[in-house]
């Protein structure tokens, strides 16, 4: 946290992808210099290490069905702690991430929208309960996803036995259009 950060400064959670790390996200994103120049704080949390030694966010992948870690609770508690400890803005706390971190952003929007004011997922989709049980108040979202992504396919894959079935990005965007009561234009 920069020493010169004003009270009520924004806070951004920036989450790594599957097998990634907080340090890797810090180095990859270049976000810290942007935060320092623009007066906001960035939190680079580390996910849990799974049975294969890989870091992950628990978003409902098929091969993590035996995992019981509640990352929504962990990140919500961490947000409250950082807001209180460093006088950061509860109204301006946001979540973003890459791939599995993006999928965790969706989980936070669905199940901790009272702690996170907006999300900006990059190259991720909605899995498991974020897709089947998400019911929230409208929340701003900036979705970034390439059509040539060969890991999280643009068109989705309802037969994926590795990650688990997931919808295409058109369906995900339509879901958020409905959730946020947007008008098509």
What is the meaning of each model-derived region?
Residues 1-3:
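A short loop-to-beta-strand scaffold at the N-terminal edge of the catalytic core in hydrolase folds
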Residues 6-94, 98, 104-107, 111:
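Serine-hydrolase catalytic machinery in alpha/beta-hydrolase-like enzymes
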Residues 27, 112, 156-160:
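Single-residue recognition of alpha-helix boundary sites
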Residues 36, 110-114, 134-138:
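Short, surface-exposed basic-aromatic patches at helix termini and helix-loop junctions that form
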Residues 46-48, 99, 125, 147-148:
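Short, flexible active-site-adjacent loop segments at beta-strand->alpha-helix junctions, enriched
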Residues 117-185:
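The feature captures the conserved acid-bearing segment of alpha/beta-hydrolase catalytic domains
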């Amino acid at each position: 946290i920069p020493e010169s950060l004003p009270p009520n400064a924004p806070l951004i959670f920036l989450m790594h992808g599957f097998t990634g790390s907080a340090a890797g996200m810090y180095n990859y994103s270049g976000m810290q210099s942007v935060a320092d120049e623009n007066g906001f704080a960035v939190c680079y949390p580390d996910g849990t290490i799974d049975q294969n030694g890989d870091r992950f966010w628990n978003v409902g992948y098929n091969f993590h069905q035996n995992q019981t870690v509640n990352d929504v609770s962990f990140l919500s508690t961490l947000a409250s702690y950082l807001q209180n400890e460093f006088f950061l803005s509860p109204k301006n706390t946001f979540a973003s991430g890459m791939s599995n971190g993006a999928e965790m952003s969706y989980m936070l929007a669905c199940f901790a929208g009272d702690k996170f004011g907006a999300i900006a997922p990059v190259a991720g989709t909605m899995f498991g309960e974020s897709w089947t049980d998400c019911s929230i108040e409208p929340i701003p979202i900036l979705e970034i996803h390439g059509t040539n992504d060969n890991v999280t396919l643009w068109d989705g894959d309802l037969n994926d036995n590795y990650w688990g079935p997931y919808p295409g990005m058109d369906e995900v965007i339509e879901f958020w259009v409905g959730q946020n009561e947007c008008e098509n234009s």
